[in-house]
Amino acid sequence: MLHCAGPHTGKLVKQVAACCLLLPRFLLTGLMLWLLDFQCIRRRVLLTAREESTAEHEDPPLCVSDSNRMCTVESLRAVWHGQKLDYFKSAHLGCSAPNTEVVMLEGRRLCKILDFSQGKRPLVVNFGSCTUPPFMARLQAYRRLAAQHVGIADFLLVYIEEAHPSDGWLSTDASYQIPQHQCLQDRLAAAQLMLQGAPGCRVVVDTMDNSSNAAYGAYFERLYIVLEGKVVYQGGRGPEGYKISELRMWLEQYQQGLMGTKGSGQVVIQV
């Protein structure tokens, strides 16, 4: 009996420790969301972000309509969920990339993320959903970048749980109003909408147990690059840390490294 209790006790201790570590950041985020519900503060923050933007064509500044409430029970629940996923993720820079299961749109065939990695080519993994305004605002920039670097890298879009479901933390700025996925068919249907906005891109969906989202701490959206089974680029959590410009910079430096060394290609860049 004591032997059985050991793993459960360890798990409980880890959960409690995580809550203690995450609570200050969560409370700070909650305070920021509450302040952003004051229109004068929100407009000032968004204006400052727009003025400081240096790669607007790739990473357009965050846009939040006045009608959107920022501090609600649903928003706080979503923030806590995202912060917990980030804390418990198994993907880390320089470590082995989790080879989680995903579902292909064609034939609903189950496969694994690293199945899309070809030899020594980098695999760019882009996690997101149609109800995430920053993700959708950058989708065309991602598509252009993929087309420009298709000769040196592979690209994969992974559709995860909705960032702003219509029955949760609703965003009127979202391109689509989609409720939380109740079954795999719901997720596949939502992914088809993403594919329409990014024709030519390879799109798969996370399983309904959200294994890829959990392993990569991908919620709300996130970028990764995997090279020979290792995580060589880990983007920040969206929306603030989700930057196509960083992805472009990594790929350009990697390409320059290939041209300079004629082959080794082991480029690990942390940005």
From Swiss-Prot:
Enzyme class: oxidoreductase
Organism of derivation: Xenopus laevis (African clawed frog)
Record topology, Cytoplasmic segments: 1-15
UniProt record similarity statement: Belongs to the iodothyronine deiodinase family.
Database matches in PANTHER family: IODOTHYRONINE DEIODINASE, THYROXINE 5-DEIODINASE
Primary location group: membrane
Annotated GO MF terms: thyroxine 5'-deiodinase activity; thyroxine 5-deiodinase activity
Subcellular location as annotated: Cell membrane; Endosome membrane
Stated role: Plays a crucial role in the metabolism of thyroid hormones (TH) and has specific roles in TH activation and inactivation by deiodination. Catalyzes the deiodination of L-thyroxine (T4) to 3,3',5'-triiodothyronine (rT3), 3,5-diiodothyronine (3,5-T2) to 3-monoiodothyronine (3-T1), rT3 to 3',5'-diiodothyronine (3',5'-T2) and 3,3'-diiodothyronine (3,3'-T2) to 3'-monoiodothyronine (3'-T1) via inner-ring deiodination (IRD). Catalyzes the deiodination of 3,5,3'-triiodothyronine (T3) to 3,3'-diiodothyronine (3,3'-T2) via IRD.
Topological domains annotated Extracellular: 37-271
EC identifiers of the protein: 1.21.99.3
Protein name: Thyroxine 5-deiodinase
Classification lineage: Eukaryota, Metazoa, Chordata, Craniata, Vertebrata
GO biological process, one term: thyroid hormone catabolic process
Protein's gene: dio3
